[in-house]
């Protein structure tokens, strides 16, 4: 990895979601509360996306800092440069095929431990009493919590004596740790890489394929991330004075996650988990998942799906005009295409009577799609003259 590739190089993960990217900076903070990102240069092309490159395709990484970066790349690199060189075939190398894989198991850490429901209810009531308020949990609810915890009561809640509903916030008697309910104990990620390289007297090539799958931590309504990578590098001496180089890469990543139902969760399930009372039921006596748990939103609700396609390729001709004198012409296409869909699916909860009731903030049923694209075309033409005179070098 990049960590440790150079002094002062800091890499920070932006969250724990399967599609979380990484932020990179050199020398830490560059201003009050901010840290500028270094310029990424992949095979001589500026502005590559380091989060979409397959690490298995990388041959070497180097870091340029401070004045050295500005001297070469000018105002494009005020925060340093990370140079990435991808693999190529080597002259005289026979055809080589490589395959490797990696399986990773992850567990959430640092999750709060919730009080059991009876302890929570008593402390909650005491806090209200300290302020001169009435208790939120009555004695009947407290007795049922105790009975549920000692095993004499089997259901997590009971029906209200009036109306067609189950007792919830102040009346349910479950004993749930919502962090353990919402999150898996372990999630798995896997990565597979295939590389083919080779060379003849006049040409060399490298082709790399990569597949990366990351499972999320949701126990219900699994969130997941997939990325596919393709890279092809080719260099060929067409004549003794003309060389053709091609470098191309394509990546596609797809993130599929439950819709957050902003009106009900505030757009953040973590926000909801921290607010849930441990006495709330996961399952009602009729066997249906409760409305208040919000698990139905994860399990049966709509999905948010985002797909990013990123093609980039460079074609280059290098002509040797004379000893130490070359001319180069190249063209680069750099594109990014994003497609996102958001589905709000109307959900229903089962009532004690057997009737279904619409869950609040899940209607109307809706579907939205957005599409964004970015394209950049770069053409360069330049000449180089390189002359060595003893201990002196002239390069123009």
Outline where the language-model segments fall.
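Short, well-ordered coil/turn residues that connect adjacent beta-strands
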Residues: 59-60, 240, 313, 323
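Short secondary-structure capping/turn segments at boundaries of alpha-helices and beta-strands
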Residues: 71, 193-194, 314-316, 335, ...
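Surface-exposed loop/interface segments of Gram-negative outer-membrane beta-barrel transport/assembly proteins
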Residues: 91-175, 212, 216-312, 328-330, ...
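Residue-level signature of outer-membrane beta-barrel architecture
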Residues: 86, 198-200, 236-237, 317-319, ...
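Short, small/polar-rich motifs associated with maturation and membrane association
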Residues: 1-231, 243-245
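Short structured motifs
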Residues: 10, 191-193, 299, 314, ...
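Proline-centered flexible-loop/turn and helix-kink motifs
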Residues: 7, 275-279, 323
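Solvent-exposed aromatic/hydrophobic patches embedded in short alpha-helical segments
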Residues: 39-42, 238, 312, 316
């Amino acid at each position: 990895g990049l960590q440790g590739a150079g002094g002062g190089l800091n890499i920070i993960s932006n969250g724990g979601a399967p599609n979380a990217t990484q932020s990179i900076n050199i020398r830490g903070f560059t201003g009050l509360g901010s840290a500028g990102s270094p310029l990424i240069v992949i095979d001589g092309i500026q502005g590559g996306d380091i989060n979409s490159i397959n690490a298995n395709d990388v041959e070497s990484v180097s870091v340029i800092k401070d004045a050295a970066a500005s001297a070469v790349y000018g105002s494009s690199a005020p925060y340093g440069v990370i140079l990435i060189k991808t693999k190529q075939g080597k002259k005289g190398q026979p055809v080589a095929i490589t395959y490797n894989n990696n399986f990773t198991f992850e567990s959430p850490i640092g999750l709060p431990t919730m009080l059991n429901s009876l302890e929570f209810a008593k402390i909650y009531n005491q806090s209200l009493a300290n302020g001169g308020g009435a208790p939120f949990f009555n004695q009947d609810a407290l007795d049922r919590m105790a009975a549920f915890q000692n095993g004499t009561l089997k259901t997590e809640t009971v029906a209200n004596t009036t109306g067609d509903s189950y007792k919830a916030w102040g009346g349910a008697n479950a004993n749930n740790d919502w962090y353990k309910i919402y999150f898996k104990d372990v999630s798995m990620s896997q990565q597979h890489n295939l590389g083919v390289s080779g060379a003849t007297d006049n040409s060399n090539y490298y082709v790399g394929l990569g597949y990366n799958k990351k499972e999320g931590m949701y126990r219900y309504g699994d969130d997941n991330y997939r990325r596919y990578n393709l890279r092809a590098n080719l260099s060929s001496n067409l004549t003794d004075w003309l060389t053709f180089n091609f470098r191309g890469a394509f990546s596609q990543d797809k993130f599929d996650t439950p819709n957050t139902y902003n009106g009900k969760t505030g757009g953040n399930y973590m926000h909801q988990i921290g607010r849930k009372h441990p006495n709330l039921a996961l399952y009602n006596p009729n066997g249906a998942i409760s409305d208040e748990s919000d698990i139905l939103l994860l399990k049966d609700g709509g999905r948010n799906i985002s797909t990013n396609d990123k093609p980039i390729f460079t074609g280059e001709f290098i002509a040797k005009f004379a000893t130490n004198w070359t001319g180069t012409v190249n063209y680069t296409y750099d594109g990014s295409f994003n497609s996102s869909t958001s589905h709000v699916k109307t959900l229903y909860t089962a009532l004690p009577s057997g009737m279904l009731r619409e869950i609040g903030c899940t209607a109307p049923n809706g579907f939205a799609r957005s599409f964004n694209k970015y394209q950049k075309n770069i053409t360069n033409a330049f000449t180089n003259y390189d002359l060595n005179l003893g201990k002196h070098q002239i390069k123009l």
